[in-house]
Amino acid sequence: MTMGNFLKRFGSGKSRSSRNMTLGTTSSQSHEPSPSDPSLSLADNTNATKKKYALIPDRFSSLDQVSKALREAGLESSNLILGVDFTKSNEWTGKTSFDGKCLHALGETSNPYEKAIFVIGQTLAPFDEDNLIPCFGFGDSTTHDEEVFGFHSDNSPCHGFEEVLACYKRIAPNLRLSGPTSYGPLIDAAVDIVEKNNGQFHVLVIVADGQVTRGTDMAEGELSQQEKTTIDAIVNASSYALSIVLVGVGDGPWEDMRKFDDKIPKREFDNFQFVNFTEIMTRNSPESAKETAFALAALMEIPFQYQAAIELRLLGKQTGLAKTIVPRPPPIPYTPPTNAELPSTASPASPEQTQSCPICLTNRKDVAFSCGHMTCGDCGSKISNCPICRVRITNRLKLYT
């Protein structure tokens, strides 16, 4: 059975019924409090539900099991939102997995982001009934860790994943990769979409190459500003009918993302999961088997998250508290100078260019590492490996002018 046919078994109607459900080892009886049962208050029931879905385990071993659980939960379709990471680290996290090239490099061979978007389209798009996919980029020199940009200047969604790929290929060459990495603004944008769509269930898929930015000299348990922003956004998103799937591309490292749930304080339900796309797609298996494994990993927790949204009464809920997010337009294409404008001999880079931090591209370099490369102090305090040569940073020398 192809992935498309498998997922089309869910049907095309946007059913939001909360009929009795049997998911894994949970009871088949509804968890809604009975109006005739005065012993269980609404608050007690809600607290019990939060505890039940505080950490959702991976309980399925096949797509058929996921299919059955989704049908029993009443989830016949969903709405996808896509976010793409354009931070500076994409330039070096393809050293092993993409022949040393930037993960966003376009050419005859599909880059990891193109592959991930294609496979997501093959495996998850059949969930999306209307085939309208809001798409955002983040981490470039226009958004940094504070905003997102839309794939269309009018912020309209893409019509299917073919258009998603076409827009990505049009946008990628125009970008200046930057950072630092925070998923907070993207998650806030997804929450805003859920709110504006009257609490319909959505799945946010984030395709990214790295963990949230964290300084090497930070104490255990201490959080960077980007980690705080991301965690706050995830906690806030758990009050909405939204599941978050982080799809990791490139070399990683991904250790912190696998443990990220442990850093997140009490939520309404466990709404975040990580899938290592590189690990799955480099297995020695047929392509169809790898796509199936990816779909299983990405969909594993969706049935439980949807059931949690029902029991917590998040479906159809509008809080009136969601941040209103206005995405920036996609980056403007870079126009190189014409031959008439070019000097007769090559000119050396200006002092401003050579002294700009290679990560944020705005601040001046004022910190040197033991390898000899330099960044600005702000960016240099948040990385553990040199962004140029990838050597581990053991010393930082502050430079004064």
UniProtKB/Swiss-Prot annotation:
Location within or outside the cell: Cytoplasm; Nucleus
UniProtKB keywords: Cytoplasm, Jasmonic acid signaling pathway, Metal-binding, Nucleus, Transferase, Ubl conjugation pathway, Zinc, Zinc-finger
A Pfam family per the record: zf-C3HC4_3
Biased amino acid composition, Low complexity: 8-19
Reaction(s) catalysed by this chain's protein: S-ubiquitinyl-[E2 ubiquitin-conjugating enzyme]-L-cysteine + [acceptor protein]-L-lysine = [E2 ubiquitin-conjugating enzyme]-L-cysteine + N(6)-ubiquitinyl-[acceptor protein]-L-lysine
Enzyme class: transferase
Primary localization class, coarse: cytoplasm
Tissues with expression: Widely expressed.
Molecular function via GO: ubiquitin-protein transferase activity; zinc ion binding
Zinc finger (RING-type): 357-390
Biased composition (Pro residues): 327-336
Induction: Repressed by the mycotoxin fumonisin B1.
Its biological purpose: Possesses E3 ubiquitin-protein ligase in vitro. Acts as upstream modulator of jasmonate (JA) signaling in response to various stimuli, such as JA-inhibited root growth, JA-inductive gene expression, coronatine-mediated pathogen susceptibility, wound-stimulated expression of JA-responsive genes and wound-induced JA biosynthesis. Controls fumonisin B1 (FB1)-triggered programmed cell death (PCD) by modulating the JA signaling pathway. May mediate salicylic acid (SA) suppression of JA signaling in FB1-induced responses. May mediate the formation of 'Lys-48'-linked multiubiquitin chains.
PANTHER family: COPINE FAMILY PROTEIN 1 (PTHR45751), E3 UBIQUITIN-PROTEIN LIGASE RGLG4 (PTHR45751:SF16)
Protein name listed in UniProt: E3 ubiquitin-protein ligase RGLG4
Gene: RGLG4
